[in-house]
Swiss-Prot record:
SMART domains, A to Z: RING (SM00184)
Record annotation: effect of changing residue 34 to S: Loss of activity
Organism: Homo sapiens (Human)
Protein name, entry field: E3 ubiquitin-protein ligase NRDP1
Membrane-spanning residues: none
One CC-aspect GO term: perinuclear region of cytoplasm
Coiled-coil intervals: none
Subunit composition and interactions: Interacts with USP8, ERBB3, PRKN and BIRC6. Interacts with CSF2RB, EPOR, IL3RA, MYD88 and TBK1. Interacts with CLEC16A.
Amino acid sequence: MGYDVTRFQGDVDEDLICPICSGVLEEPVQAPHCEHAFCNACITQWFSQQQTCPVDRSVVTVAHLRPVPRIMRNMLSKLQIACDNAVFGCSAVVRLDNLMSHLSDCEHNPKRPVTCEQGCGLEMPKDELPNHNCIKHLRSVVQQQQTRIAELEKTSAEHKHQLAEQKRDIQLLKAYMRAIRSVNPNLQNLEETIEYNEILEWVNSLQPARVTRWGGMISTPDAVLQAVIKRSLVESGCPASIVNELIENAHERSWPQGLATLETRQMNRRYYENYVAKRIPGKQAVVVMACENQHMGDDMVQEPGLVMIFAHGVEEI
């Protein structure tokens, strides 16, 4: 449908008026033979009833329509039109070709996006702001989040159940292998290979770490701290066969000779940067696995590995 003629300043050339809606042409198209021009929406609707020109009744179809000449487009673009939002207080009069850009920024546009400044920060059309209720919106947001959290908790529980079943299957398999090892001693090597590969897979899944404050090492962690680190090891996928050994090796009483006392640690501190360390997820702690630190002397590593806990200074590389 065309633009209302009363919105324009001055007289509008009759050649720019749509014969169907009697408004100023909007998205104009032209019949090629008779050269009559119409709004695109108007003529499309007309053709749904009959395939003729509304003015002279000559045969015309949608396929025949063409854009109007440039001179007509230029005449239309120069027309001065009042803003669509005049009824809402906008007094702007702009060129027709600038109307859309003006509408997108017009402060009187009732559909212009605005942000609630009462606390919830919701973006909404301007005309909805007077009836907006922050509490109602936030309640809806909380409900959506609670629903999402419930879905995630359900998924997490399912994954934990699957993981527990897999771990149980692995333990049963290991128990089976130990049971038949007496029948075939060669299975000892097979079991050791499987466990070693399992350890390597876990170690490779951890993020490499750098310790920036070796002086913050906690060499005598209490039972509570050890339990926290053990839980993180288990959650990271640490093989059950070495979890307890690693936690035992978190205390200086189980450390190798080069780390056994404060004095020896100070003497050997220059070697610390040579350690290949992996971060225990979410903790200020690292594991120094023997399989990754064969370049270190026997007095600096321990089978299957060391757990070093720090007050601060552990960074992922």
